[in-house]
Amino acid sequence: VETISFSFSEFEPGNDNLTLQGAALITQSGVLQLTKINQNGMPAWDSTGRTLYTKPVHMWDSTTGTVASFETRFSFSIEQPYTRPLPADGLVFFMGPTKSKPAQGYGYLGVFNNSKQDNSYQTLAVEFDTFSNPWDPPQVPHIGIDVNSIRSIKTQPFQLDNGQVANVVIKYDAPSKILHVVLVYPSSGAIYTIAEIVDVKQVLPDWVDVGLSGATGAQRDAAETHDVYSWSFQASLPE
């Protein structure tokens, strides 16, 4: 069995195992800020940032056809200090081609460039979306499972607990092809789940990068924070 795992219980500035892109930075207090915070402490609009684990993950074996199961956990908070215009845009866990650069921000969350279904993206993502774009369901916020498109194949509304820490678990079971997502707010006790069948061998390249991305909106003050406090990932590919 080929395994890879990493675990950050907090983040250290200058960590060699993480590649920061766009606005993303790690604070002295150990928080990964995916989008920009202005000097006045308020979130900036028109900001996109991502972090990637520096080593690629072997998701499936092109010789034997075996597929990896994986589990990732992270905790984050989204704080929305403004009520007008509507806060935007969200945070996303994604897996896709190695050495990719940030895509469009705003509602595309730094992972996609348009709203088309395009298999060349070779990307699987789980979004925590706070703004309803034309391709989104009307309910916001929502969890979405994205396969080669920002148009989610399945969504689940959730109630944002403003500024509070959310814990996420995303599991993929290769034999059943089930991707299962759980979002928990310890502060309120709220639990949200969503699951869908995804054939990762048909979606992803055999080697992928895994990352987190966040984006704020295209209008002045259409902004919120996207802060990540911990992140772990493990994958195992059978022989």
Swiss-Prot record:
CDD domains: lectin_legume_LecRK_Arcelin_ConA. InterPro entries: ConA-like_dom_sf (IPR013320), L-lectin (IPR016363), Lectin_LegA_CS (IPR000985), Lectin_legB_Mn/Ca_BS (IPR019825), Legume_lectin_dom (IPR001220), Leguminous_Lectin (IPR050258). Binds one manganese ion and one calcium ion. Glycans are attached at residues 17, 113. Keywords: Glycoprotein, Lectin. One of its GO terms (molecular function) is carbohydrate binding. This is Lectin. It comes from the Eukaryota. Homodimer. Galactose and N-acetyllactosamine specific lectin. It comes from Erythrina crista-galli (Cockspur coral tree). Belongs to the leguminous lectin family. PROSITE patterns: LECTIN_LEGUME_ALPHA, LECTIN_LEGUME_BETA. Pfam families: Lectin_legB.
